[in-house]
Amino acid sequence: MANSFLEASARDRVQAVCDAGSFQEILKPSDRISSPHMALLEQPVAFDDGVVIGRATLGGVPVLVAAQEGEFLGGAIGEVHGAKITALIAKAVQEKPRAVLLIFESGGVRLHEANAGLIAVSEIMRAVCSARAQGVQFIGLIGGSAGCFGGTGLIARCCDVLIMSEEGRLAMSGPEVIETVYGVEEFDSRDRALVWRVSGGKH
């Protein structure tokens, strides 16, 4: 991986974590799966809707993988983005891989899509919990520059195992949101040491 995990793209992270050459992407950008809501709002779209999903091996054993792309709308979850992850989890219940790897990088719900994004988060959480009850193991990885916030943070806490890098951040609300609601006197989002003490992987 040419870049650090912190700065890498979703596909680079998958390639770095999984066995070399083993990743087989499901619903590639060439399939042109994007959010209908963004087009209606004349907002930019991505033909993978900001999440990469597929099959791979890790240490020689089969896994399913989903990796969020923080460079597209901060990795925010919308209807199609969420549906791809939920469908991958349904596939895991059928195929019974050794684990499902969820590589998180998201600020939470895609506000452009309002309730569709909130519903997508709840559907992913329900799918994870249901799959776990059927013996599927979930491993979450957090290390992207966008962090893991909002509804995505809730999904992360549903995993069996959660791995964070020192640069990873996990919280319900991001530092700027906390500052906006409670004021800079209560929480200064520019105080990087404070931010990392509260939500960072290294305490």
Predicted regions and their residues:
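Conserved catalytic cores of soluble enzyme domains
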Residues: 108-203
